[in-house]
A protein has these predicted regions:
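Beta-sandwich/jelly-roll carbohydrate-recognition scaffolds of carbohydrate-active enzymes
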Residues: 1-162
Length: 162
């Protein structure tokens, strides 16, 4: 793992077989919930996550915008979203009642309190995958500009050496 002022890059080494990369927007270091995800391409996602309620200040809430890229196309990908608990007739027919629902064929935007994206890979022994993340407190476009400006044309090792 390495970073620049407004970006991060992680390198993961996997065994042979099925491997996965997850971006969990339902968990965080603060108590605030709410996120939005959009699949831009097979290897790029963008969105926003609300952060806040930090240091006992419930009004200190702010968005963090991001662009995430992976360096290899996954064999499959999708979203997950925690479903609200239901009662009565609704609960009887919904197998995902109060649980996490996987969206394996849905490729449009998704929003919610407990969402994420998964990418599945068939990897070889010691295969390395890299994940780049640009962030901004201003906009998704600024997050993309930060990623392009601080990592474009650089390898993981070059960023790590800086």
């Amino acid at each position: 793992m390495s970073a620049t002022p407004r970006t991060g890059v992680s390198r993961f080494t996997f065994p042979a077989g099925q491997s996965h990369i997850l971006l969990n927007l339902g968990e965080g270091l603060t108590n605030e919930t709410g996120a939005f995800l959009k699949q831009v391409s097979d290897t790029e996602f963008e969105g926003v996550k609300l952060l806040g309620t930090f240091c006992y200040n419930p009004q200190a809430v702010f968005p963090i915008y991001f662009v995430m890229r992976v360096n290899k196309q996954p064999t499959s990908s999708g979203y997950w979203k925690k479903q609200r608990p239901m009662t009565g007739v609704e609960a009887e027919w919904d197998k995902d009642n109060g649980k996490f629902k996987l969206y394996t064929n849905y490729k449009k935007d998704i929003a919610g309190d407990d969402i994420g994206v998964f990418m599945n890979y068939d990897t070889k022994t010691n295969e390395q995958l890299e994940v780049q993340m640009g962030v901004s407190f201003v906009s998704i476009e600024n997050a993309r500009q930060n990623l392009e400006g601080e990592q474009k044309g650089k390898t993981f090792d070059q960023i790590h050496a800086e």
